[in-house]
């Protein structure tokens, strides 16, 4: 179960790196802003700085999970699991906030929250 938990944490981290790329690098490209239900190029430009900041938030969560995975495998499980649970727990809570924002966000919240949920649950079960 440890391996499964860490694989789900890795997938969650990679997804959050992808989200970072969209929010902080390609936000003003039509394909990206349409993904986030932005309705115009002008609105994408207006929200660019907010998305840029949010993207880095997602990147830092991903880095925390990745460093945690490495620490577990490098023989520092206390440090590693602390980082994995903290990072994936934050990803999961952010997905719950997104889901609570309205029905139109449920799909995005499920995509964002499923892998960190599995990482946390399987990690807890593995460590019991």
Segments predicted by a language model, with ranges:
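Transmembrane helix-loop junctions in multipass membrane proteins, especially transporters and channels
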Residues: 24-32, 73-77, 103-107, 124-128
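N-terminal signal-anchor transmembrane alpha helix
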Residues: 2-26
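Hydrophobic residues within alpha-helical transmembrane segments
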Residues: 7-10, 14, 56, 89, ...
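Transmembrane helix-loop-helix
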Residues: 67-96, 100-114
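Interfacial helix-start motif at the membrane-water boundary
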Residues: 42-60
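Core segments of transmembrane alpha-helices
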Residues: 54-67, 115-116
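Cytosolic, membrane-interface loops and tails of multi-pass inner-membrane proteins
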Residues: 25-47
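Small-residue-rich segments of transmembrane alpha-helices in multi-pass membrane proteins
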Residues: 113-128
């Amino acid at each position: 179960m440890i391996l499964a938990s860490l694989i789900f944490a890795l997938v969650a981290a990679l997804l959050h790196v992808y989200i970072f790329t969209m929010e902080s690098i390609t936000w003003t490209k039509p394909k990206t802003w349409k993904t986030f239900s932005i309705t115009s190029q002008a609105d994408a430009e207006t929200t660019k700085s907010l998305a840029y900041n949010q993207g880095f938030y997602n990147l830092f969560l991903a880095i925390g999970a990745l460093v945690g995975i490495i620490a577990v495998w490098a023989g520092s499980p206390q440090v590693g699991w602390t980082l994995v649970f903290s990072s994936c727990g934050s990803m999961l809570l952010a997905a719950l906030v997104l889901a609570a924002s309205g029905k139109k966000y449920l799909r995005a919240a499920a995509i964002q929250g499923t892998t960190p949920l599995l990482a946390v649950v399987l990690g807890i079960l593995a460590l019991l």
